[in-house]
Curated annotation (Swiss-Prot):
SUPFAM superfamilies: EGF/Laminin. GO terms for molecular function: calcium ion binding. The keyword Calcium applies. One of its GO terms (cellular component) is extracellular space. This is Dendrite extension defective protein 1. Residues 1-41 form the signal peptide. The gene is dex-1. Residues 43-1005 are extracellular. It comes from the Eukaryota. Residues 1027-1037 are cytoplasmic. Residues 916-933 have a biased composition (Low complexity).
Amino acid sequence: MLAHTHRINKCLYGQNQMRNRHALLGALPPIFLLLLPLISCMKFDPERIAARLRIDEKWDQLDAFQSIKSRRGRQIQPKEISIQVTAPLFSSRLFDYGTTAGDEELPQALDVGKKLDLVHPISFFGSDYKTIYILSNGAVGFEASSRSYKSGILPSSTRFLAPFWNRNDLRNGGKVYYREVTKGRVLERGQSEIRYQYDKNVKVKSALIITWDKMQPLNTAALPEENTNTFQAAIFITANGTFANFIYSNIGWTQGAEAGFNAGDATNHFKLPTSGTPNIMYLEEYGNTGIPGEWMFELSELRVISCKSGIKGDTCDQECSNGEWGPDCAYCCHCSEGTCHPISGDCQRGCATCWDGVACQTRQEKCATKTQCASNALSFNDYDRCGEPIQRCQCLNGYKGDGYNNCEDVDECKTNSTICHKNAICTNTPGRYFCMCKEGFSGDGQNDCSQSFLFQYDTHHQLPRKKNSKMEWNLKKPLKIFGETTEKLTVTSTGLIAINEVNRDNGRLEDMQLVGIAPFFGPIDLSRNGAVSVEEVDDVEVLRRVTRTIGENYNDPTFVAKSALVVTFSNVTDGRQTKGNTFQALLIDGSNSKNEKMTFVELMYRDLPWASGAEAGILSSDASSSILLPASGTEAISQLSKNSNIKQPGTWLYRIDKAQLMPCAQPIQVPPYCDRLLSTAPRLPSKLLEEKKEGLTLPSPGAFLVDQPSETIVPTLVRGGGTVTRGRNVLTVTTSPIGNQQRQQTTKAVTRPRPNFSSTPHRPIVSLSDEDFELGPDAFEVTFPPFVTVQPELFRPNQRNGVQKSTQRPLPDFSIRTPLKEEATTSVPREKTSSAAPAHSPIEEMSENEESPFEAGSFDGEAVKFNEELEAIDKALQTTKKQRPELSVTPQPEDLSGDARVIETTEEDEEEAEISTETTTEMSSTTTTTKAHTTTTTMMIPTEAPPSIFVFTTTQKPRAQSTTQKRIIVQQPSIVVNSQPPKQRNDNQPTVNVGHAEEQSPRLAILLPVMIILAWLVILVCIGAVVCCKRRNSRESSQLRAMYGAAYGVRPTAYESKRKESTYEDHLERAARLSGQPALSGQQAGKVSLYGSYWNLEPLSNHSPARLSTQERQSPPSFVNNGYTNQTTRYTYAGHY
């Protein structure tokens, strides 16, 4: 039985294998076909069936082999299919437009609006309009005033239907076409679009087609066509309403464009996605119709509908959520189960409580009861998501509760301790709270309470509130006042802080013999109003504040305040005024780094509304140094709260530890306000007074130093002649005595009276009066480059013969900016860039018993001799002309920083220099000043900045012209000044003057560019030669590769044959030998090389010719970077060399 069953299973398996061999059985009845396998299995021999199965298996293997072979063939040479897909598959479809379509055109102007009367009116937000205006700025208006462009129209008070509201300039390019269609394919297409978008069967009566083609912006150059804007508005008028179809073909730029619908009530409007943003370009790529760039809208009476019932979203691609239904899912469900049909809004189980009617949208009157809110609550009507009114109650600010039952006050001061500033006081009131800064602090009380003008005094000791009250205060730390140590002070209500006994408290300060401080001495009556408080404090904040004030004004950062006595007069009056004065006086004790005990008084006036003849001052024990404050004793004393002596309005600071008081912090400041400095610079006198001329004395021969570039001349007064040590920047003249000793004795015997020209070393050369010192503090500001002052020395008259007569004795040139000084040795400061030089030149003075050469002889007898001496001196100075320096002008590159440079030349350059000044008879002080002017030219380029334009393609945005100032710096040539003493001039060498340097400048201006151009030409020629050589080598190499095949090139050799040199004939023999080997014939298929087979890095047995891929069999081997130079590398080759 098991054998029979096995036999039946094999028969069934054979039946499945032979289904393709018995096609004739398909025509037999189905029942016979099921019985036939069983019958055949019982009648036929199983061995024959097994043999048939083996044959069928062989056939199946053969079919599989052929199928695999077919796939391999397809893999070796696949069929290339090129598919070009453009995304998106659909694009916006503009209606036909232009003159060929029968359109009319707007004029080529700016802000154009064309009036058009329609056949059928447009329904827009519940109103019908038969007259519209076609606007060039990308909209359809319903009013004549809508043609003017203005931004922010959504929302606004003007009715618009705007596909793309933008400022277009038709004068710059672009056209606007429009036409009204009442029949034809346009109406049919509009009808089908409406039916597809809203599932409504409507009949289109007319259509208005408006096309804005290639719009250009305003105030810019014309953009390329791909950057222009092209869009269309198709308005379909039906019996069931108006539909608007916006079609965007190309959006290339925007200037804040907007798209949408505006009802004109400044509230109701509809904006397209990305309207008013730079992303408005995406209107071309998206749409709510399923086609990019096409948007369809239904203009109903109340609002604009974008999607059909059951759909919502900007692009109408979302279904309504639970509880929503209708177009744009704008309606809410009022069903008992909470959900309704998304299209019709039907409720399967009925409406919810208080709702009935179609789709449960009617609210019952019994549910419309008004709710009574609690006290301190606000009742208002709110709207839910569906726009339905809901009455709500809410507690007012400062109260908590539900608003319907109760609203309790919130105590913010208890619930939040940090709600006010730490220096403020919190006060709670019903529904509110207040933060008030403490006394002595000012601010909003919540975020800021900084220390006020006056120091805090609300906790200080107060004087009795009566007239003429006093208080004696014993100091915890004694104060040094007016040179004496004080331990007790008396404070009176009349505004006095006295050190001595106060005998009377009325009259004037000068009559009271008072020693102390009077911040505001007046008829103050505390019994009427105000208060006076006193306290000695050591608070850190107070001391830090006064320390900073004193350190900043007295230039002593080491001063530290240790204690302060604070006396405050708060809102004090004389009994007749309604508004009182408030001021404060601080006596500050401290010391500096030298442990010097210092005391200051700081008077601070906040409010001084009344005066009544009051006085203010500091009365020292030395009456001559007492200080009365400005306007003391007058009605103008109220100005103390606005003025100051430390540049802080209302604050006056004085140092009082010494008997001699100083009205200002610095001795060079001008009292009483100390807001400017004393002028110590002399004013140049217009002429020398007669009494001053008599005291003038000519200086003795000596050395005159070349001054440093600080615009200061410091003449040296020298008595007698001597040896002068020569140094750098010192012009030294060696002179012999004017007369011998015998001549001096002879001339001294003459008794005729004569003027005395002698002088003492301590007497100044020039005497100036007080009015000559009237220069401002900025008189010494250097506004030009430094200059060099050359002062030649005097020569004795017997140095050279042949003199020129001079009948007039010139006076020295006193063109200086600082007072003259007398000194035996003068230090000459040098600039950092100059070379090292002796700081001063020692000068030997004449002995006191030696007589000056100018004192010998009488006036009458020496008149002729004196003139001869002057002529001799003049002629002696003539000998220095060959040694006088010269100012050389060297053109320098333009200095963009605007700073002129002073360059010092060497001694060799000084030999060719000449001085341009003339020497005088006795002493000539000549100043040569050369200024390098810097001219700054400022040019303003007016530009008109166009509005910002967003261009959405690769076209670059036009650049706005810059409105910044352009500065052209014109720099004069720098001055080269000699810095070394001149040597003996060589007459054979030519003199180089300024004119010659100017002649050289044009030549250099031409020569330098020519040399630069020649250098560049040489570089270019070299580069061209290198490039040509490389191209020639590459061309020859390519010819060889074409002749000998792809295998031509550098070939690696085995290590064994490394030292053996082979020839071209050896390669030919090897090629002939290899060509006769049949084992390698398959590998040589398709080769064009004459050198045999390609070499491989692996044995030949691993690479069967039949299994090589196309790339392996056809691509030449790579000879790049295979380590050919490494002698230790060994290769295995498929070929035999």
